[in-house]
Amino acid sequence: MAAKKSGASKELSPMMRQYLDVKKQYADYLLLFRVGDFYETFFDDAATISAAVNIVLTRRSNGSAPDIPMAGFPYHASEGYIARLVRKGFKVAVCEQVEDPAEAKGIVKREITEIVTPGVTYSDSILEDRHNNYLAAVAFLKEGRTPVAGIAYLDVTTAEFRIASLPPHSLRDTILSLGPAELLVSSSEKSRLEDLVRGYATGMLVTGLDDWMFSEEQAETVLSRQFRTHSLKGFGIEGNRAGRVAAGVVLQYLDETRQSRRAYITRISEMQGGEFMTLDLQTKRNLEIVSSMQDGSPHGSLLQVMDRTVNPMGARLIRRWLQRPLRVAEAIAERHDGVEELLQSSELSEGVRCSLSEINDLERSLARIATFRTSPREVLQMGRSLAVFPQLRDLLLPALSARLRSLAAVLQPLPELVSEIERSVDPECGATVRDGGYIRSGCNDELDELRSVSSMAKERLMDIQREEREKTGISSLKVQYNRVFGYYIEISRANLDRVPEGYMKKQTLVNAERYTIPALKAYEEKILNAEERSLRLEAEIFQALCASIAERAASIQESALAIAEIDTLASFALSAKEYGYCKPEMKEHEGLLITEGRHPVLERIMKPDEPFVKNDCHFDGQQRMLMITGPNMAGKSSYLRQTGLIVLLAQAGSFVPAERAEIGMVDRIFTRVGASDNLASGESTFLVEMNEAASILNNATSSSLILLDEIGRGTSTFDGMSIAWSMSEYIITRLGARTLFATHYHELSELEERLPGVVNYNATVVESGERVIFLRKIVRGSTDNSYGIEVARMAGMPNEVIERAREIMSGLERKDVSFADRSFSVQENMQISLFDEVDSRLKTALQDLDLERLTPIEALLELEKLQKLLRGHS
């Protein structure tokens, strides 16, 4: 802050002293200070906002003190500017003028009226309607000697509120998978949590709070107050101490950010790990569930293919379902049966989707209505949405699917509330309450009377205009109104000599003068008084209506959840119909059988004349690890991802892209596919790879599905091969998990003879002269050719480099290299016998060459090193 608190502060203007007093209380927020028609910022805030939203940084006179930095924007444009600031991770406090400046005695009174943070916002300008916007908190406790991390997350716009307890080592994955907009931590833990997610999370604000807010006693107090109960046993969270503390922190933060109207948050539940398949962040990224690895956008993701929902509530739910597949067989079967019935009955499916399209985003509308941040138009739409419930209910109650029937039974039509909304809100209402006129005529007798008075008075004004024209002989005389000067008589400058003596001047314009007269003042007072009372009464009626809707929050929220699920099941059914998916059979054993499986995303983005190659996948007691060899671009990685996505879709409740699928329940899917440096954490490609591999070996069970692609390629050939071999042994002998292992190490195919459960497969190719055709078909057996040079040719390498690489490869395969390379200035046709040299270092250097990873240029450089080594011994 630029202002000093010594004697210099006495030189500040009264308004700036007021500003600094407020800023002191909200030091961590950008303070928007209302001055007339603008929101102004000062000192450091001004510089920050100027840079963040590209507005002019200027200076303001400050009495006898030096000028101060200032930046601002018009109040009517505030929503857009606040949205831009919050999306960039800033917290904003809005300080409004709470009295009329014309009536103020001294400095205008101002108060904080709104606080907006990334995790606490109701603004459509900030929110994405197809994403949840979570506010999360983390608390650390000890249960005995064991440290436990509690996490709670709340979406204030939908009232979804959940808690969980987990070991601290799982915290990063949980936070990043959840993707909260804002994370609350104790100030003493803030640096540690920021370090934990640095390099992984973008756009997440970490907010430090006072340590005293993280006490169990404090949590119990705020939770009991929120849910109006002496015990939390009814919510099933009484055993989760750390999670309850985190939930208490979330509610206290809502107090701090002035979110006092939160009675619509009616429930809290524990996230039970046993109900859901575990997908760590790496697996979600590698399988491209909600975003592509290429650019992080939804394009090319599983979500983009599967999301056929028609309602934002359904869109948010299908996103959650795909990231949290089920592990409970009965619940999965209920979803499959619901999808099947919607798939088999086009009439039912189309009727359901038509009804869903008429329903508004009830969750977010309810949150805005309950907090009085709504509009008449939104309340009217709430009534229209509730009115659709009976027809949707009637469609689904006769269904054969038990799940569809139970969802239909949840829908509560609330006819009394629908009637109350229809009686109260004018169907032609505007988008805001500012100008009134949104309460329907006949709703309230007093309001109708005030409107009648106002209407009659306005008719009298027209009479005054006619009378004054006759009296003065000025035919252009007009009685008009504006917000600043009220009602007035306007006379053009050409007619000023005809103005009667009784006219009182009100305003001078370039081409006219404005006057008033006693009769006009009397009716103005009557009109404005009636209009002011009308506006006030309309606001009271509207707030009472909003409160009436909020009283039904629990029922509306339950119906909203049912509607979201119906929408998601209908979306799955539409995908199954249009894409040709089959109903998977869920089994209790740990096998897996996929017949003619397809990759759900790749088959949608391929060219029409390029049919997708279908592949089978089979695991049972004898086949636990499929060792897949073959060249790059032959489809190994796609096959791994395809298998993982089919299992994920099945356990999410969807049909799957296959001719037939039997899925033994999977508790976790692990992926080790591709790698890159994590520079932010100082981790090399190989270290990242080994961290991921270690996590798999330490956490997988016999019920897991492991997808491994090129383990060990980040180090030397023999190191990598040894690690891959050892991992394979460990998985087979210790874990027994179903594993797909794609590798360039053809030597690993020997494991089929050594380890029961390992079975060789390969990605087939057809050779045509020096060219190869990748068939992308996975078949039984192994291969020992990677066709790396052919891939280099397809990538556009110069022909000279390709031919030289073939020459070098041919020599290496004969364990004899003969070459004449002018770039190394060696004697023409020099013959080198690599194994005549007695120096063992030469032999070791050759053995360490990783031929599968070397590019042609790198191969030449390695040969140059061998030459130099030879010369040193000649």
Curated annotation (Swiss-Prot):
| Record-linked SUPFAM superfamilies | DNA repair protein MutS, domain I, DNA repair protein MutS, domain II, DNA repair protein MutS, domain III, P-loop containing nucleoside triphosphate hydrolases
Which keywords does this chain's UniProt record carry?
ATP-binding, DNA damage, DNA repair, DNA-binding, Nucleotide-binding
Gene3D superfamilies, alphabetized: 1.10.1420.10, DNA repair protein MutS, domain I, MutS, connector domain, P-loop containing nucleotide triphosphate hydrolases
Which biological process, per GO, is one annotated for this protein?
Answer: mismatch repair
Which CDD domains does the entry link to? ABC_MutS1 (cd03284)
Q: Which GO terms describe its cellular component?
A: cytosol
InterPro entries for this protein: DNA_mismatch_repair_MutS, DNA_mismatch_repair_MutS-lik_N, DNA_mismatch_repair_MutS/MSH, DNA_mismatch_repair_MutS_C, DNA_mismatch_repair_MutS_clamp, DNA_mismatch_repair_MutS_core, DNA_mismatch_repair_MutS_N, DNA_mismatch_repair_MutS_sf
- Which GO molecular function entries does the Swiss-Prot or TrEMBL record give? ATP binding; ATP-dependent DNA damage sensor activity; damaged DNA binding; mismatched DNA binding
The protein's superkingdom reads: Bacteria
The UniProt record gives the binding positions of ATP as G630, P631, N632, M633, A634, G635, K636, S637
Task: Name the family the entry cites.
Answer: Belongs to the DNA mismatch repair MutS family.
Describe the task this protein carries out: This protein is involved in the repair of mismatches in DNA. It is possible that it carries out the mismatch recognition step. This protein has a weak ATPase activity.
Under the heading HAMAP family, the entry gives:
MutS (MF_00096)
The record, for PANTHER family, names: DNA MISMATCH REPAIR PROTEIN MSH1, MITOCHONDRIAL (PTHR11361:SF34), DNA MISMATCH REPAIR PROTEIN MUTS FAMILY MEMBER (PTHR11361)
State what protein this is by name: DNA mismatch repair protein MutS
Its source organism is Chlorobium phaeovibrioides (strain DSM 265 / 1930)
Lineage of the source organism? Bacteria, Pseudomonadati, Chlorobiota, Chlorobiia, Chlorobiales
Gene that encodes the chain: mutS
